[in-house]
Every structure is written in structure tokens, then in C-alpha cells.
Amino acid sequence: MLTKRIIPCLDVTAGRVVKGVNFVGLRDAGDPVEIAKRYDTQGADELTFLDITATSDGRDLILHIIEDVASQVFIPLTVGGGVRTVADVRRLLNAGADKVSMNSSAVANPDLVSDAAAYYGSQCIVVAIDAKQTEAGNWEVFTHGGRTATGMDVVEWAKEVAKRGAGEILLTSINRDGSKDGFDLALTAAVSDAVSLPVIASGGVGNLQHLVDGITKGHADAVLAASICHYSEYTVGQAKEYMAAQGIPVRI
């Protein structure tokens, strides 16, 4: 088994890190630079920054925040929110991002995935998929911070972006977001088993066993965490020690 990653996720709006439940009810979690430095010290493998209202509010990229973080933190940074063009990808990479995440814009224009991967390589293109379970038991793709239904099937969309050259999929269960009930393991496994590229599980971590389950039962290659880390319930180091004790290879 390859080394598995723990990736703290920093949802950003108005220059602050926030956390909500089911993508709403946001509460302040702190300054993005200070939180990023803390996670770097704790041994996080990567960090993900998502400007969760950039697309819906029509705002520009969070370049200044990424420049500040990249000057003080020395682990890979994935950045998303408001990415609309290949030029936006370049601007974020120049600001210090190692990977760029696209979500709503990829649904609106799937060629953006293909074009960005062709220009910059699949290794730095992440497609974020926000999934909500339907009454029929399937999962539908939602965009614009979970507010807009697309009618698209999550597994089929994952296959499409994989064919178009995405390097990773960041898969979030809207139903589980902030719930602390654990990942939607059926969703995570369905997507992970359908594509050959790495899948990052997101949405619902409430304890350290949930991280283990995301890997062993959800077949994810990495696990994203926000609530349990932002409010100091657990450190990244504690999470890695727990996962290692369960036989999961992690970078200590």
C-alpha cells in the first residue's frame, strides 16, 4: 500500500478560514496564514485552500493569501475557488500553489480540465466534486458551493474528468460535510473504484477512526479533515500515529 496522505482543508471567505455544516452555517476558525503554519509544524502532508464563495460571488482569486502562505509554509498547496480559465491556473501556480482545484468551472466547461492538464500537466490539476445523495440512492454533482444542482451523476463525472487529464479528484459529500458522522464510504468507494487516479475523501470526519475508514473502506488515497483539526480536537500528528497503528502507511 502506498503512503496515504492527511490533508487539512481550509475553507476561506473574506480572508478568513471558516467551517460550516452541509456547506452552510459558517463560523470563523481563524487566520489562514497562522492556521497553515500550525499544520505545517504538525506534519501535514499537504494543505488545501478553497475560496468557497469566490464563484458564487463572482470574486477574483485569493492570490494575496496564497502568496503569504507560500512564503511561510513549505508543504504542497492545493488552491481552488474562482478558477475560470487556464490563465487563472497560471496565476495561482505563480502565486505559490502546487496544484489548482476546479469545480463549478469544470462542470460549465469540461474543456478547461483538458486544456489546463495539457498546458501544465495532470500532476497539478485537481477536480473537486461536491456530491449530494439523491432519493434514488445515487449521487448528484452540485456546484456553486453546493447550491446548484446539475443533474449529473457523480461517478460518471469522475470518469469524464479522469479521461480529460485530471490528476486527482477531491470528493466531498455535502450530506456529511461538518457532520462528524464519518465519510460517505459508499460514495467514496464508488468513485475510487471507478477511476485510476487518486481520490481524496472529504466531508464528515469526526474522529480518527473515520480517517482510517476512508482509506480501508472508502479506498481513498488521501483524507481531508477540517473540523477536527481547526478546533484542536486532534493534531495531524495524533491522526498519523493512530493511522499507523492501524497498519496504514503514513509519513511520520
UniProtKB/Swiss-Prot annotation:
Reactions catalysed: 5-[(5-phospho-1-deoxy-D-ribulos-1-ylimino)methylamino]-1-(5-phospho-beta-D-ribosyl)imidazole-4-carboxamide + L-glutamine = D-erythro-1-(imidazol-4-yl)glycerol 3-phosphate + 5-amino-1-(5-phospho-beta-D-ribosyl)imidazole-4-carboxamide + L-glutamate + H(+)
One Pfam family it belongs to: His_biosynth
Annotated localization: Cytoplasm
Coiled coil (UniProt feature): none
InterPro entries recorded: Aldolase_TIM, His_biosynth, HisF, IGPS_HisA/HisF, RibuloseP-bd_barrel
Predominant subcellular localization, coarse grouping: cytoplasm
Gene Ontology molecular function terms on file: imidazoleglycerol-phosphate synthase activity; lyase activity
Subunit structure: Heterodimer of HisH and HisF.
Function, in words: IGPS catalyzes the conversion of PRFAR and glutamine to IGP, AICAR and glutamate. The HisF subunit catalyzes the cyclization activity that produces IGP and AICAR from PRFAR using the ammonia provided by the HisH subunit.
Identification of the protein by name: Imidazole glycerol phosphate synthase subunit HisF
Organism: Polynucleobacter necessarius subsp. necessarius (strain STIR1)
Lineage: Bacteria, Pseudomonadati, Pseudomonadota, Betaproteobacteria, Burkholderiales
